[in-house]
Amino acid sequence: MITFKSFHCSRGWHLWKHWRAFHSHSNSGTLFCQNRTTDKNTHATRVVDLSYDLYDGSVLGPPLVLLHGLFGSKSNFQTIARALVRKTGRKVLTLDARNHGCSPHDDIMTYPAMSADVCQILHQLQITNCVLIGHSMGGKTAMTVALQEPKLVERLVSVDISPAPTVPQTGFPHYIAAMQKVHFEEKMPRSTARRLADEQLSSTVKEASIRQFLLTNLVQENGTFKWRVNLEVISRHLQDLLDFPEFQEPYPGPVLFLGGANSPYISSENYPEIERLFPFANVEYIFGAGHWVHADKTHDFLNAICNFVESA
């Protein structure tokens, strides 16, 4: 049974819960699709060795594992990881997804593939149980891991994303196209390369904060600047990343869906699917936060995570 916990803003979750309880008594079995296949989740894929940072803690509880979103990297969570170690005493592991950060590039970019990558690194580090926390694309990866390998995940946090196709107003296709059009001259200072890339992106990506986020992927190799994310593969698999794999069996552990109150990525339309796959979930929204909840409202984000981790 899903419960609702108010955290600054409810966004109608409790109203939906009351409606669902009434509706399920009068029309049992009609709310959710029960005949879903899992073929997409079983295809073989090559596992890659993910780059990671491990922050040591003194508490023996399950470590916290942080998964970034599209165009992000483990460096996005440096401040968050250190704060979580201080607040919880737990070890914290941050990962670079395939085709991102310092992790290898690969031709496949699907959630089953990224789930396999995460499972492999957990096995290599002898982590048999963890608190899995993922933002956006990382949230969908975390959900996939939990649904495929529930014994690995003691509890789950999905930050501003649901187990449903991502809303069509996402700007990711435009970001990819803009990044692919950026032209870099050879042998120029980093400051110049960054300024020129920002100018070229600005015609399509109007928000300066998003441009600065994309520019964290600018790296220099052999005297030439380039994007470290694998734009070609991400572009080819973008629909896979916007969708979510099909599952029938729910995850039996506790889950927190933590959304930004100013973001459309967890809406009331997603509540039925959240309850179907994650029957022991809470949905909370942080007032004043957009899609990048951890950056917009870091203090509130940390409090929500710590309260959830310590609620066992």
Swiss-Prot record:
GO terms for biological process: lipid metabolic process. Its main location: mitochondrion. One of its GO terms (cellular component) is mitochondrion. The keyword Transport does not apply. Its EC number is 3.1.1.116. It holds the Pfam family Abhydrolase_1. Keywords: Hydrolase, Mitochondrion, Transit peptide. Residues 62-297 form the AB hydrolase-1 domain. The active site is at S136 (charge relay system), E232 (charge relay system), H291 (charge relay system). Belongs to the AB hydrolase superfamily. This is sn-1-specific diacylglycerol lipase ABHD11. It comes from Xenopus laevis (African clawed frog).
